[in-house]
Swiss-Prot record:
Superkingdom in the source lineage: Eukaryota
Name of this chain's protein: Apidaecin
Entry-linked InterPro entries: Apidaecin
Purpose: Antibacterial peptide active against Gram-negative bacteria.
Amino acid sequence: GNRPVYIPPPRPPHPRL
């Protein structure tokens, strides 16, 4: 069987200072 690939949730873009 195929192993489920863990996909991390997309991180919000950090504000440029």
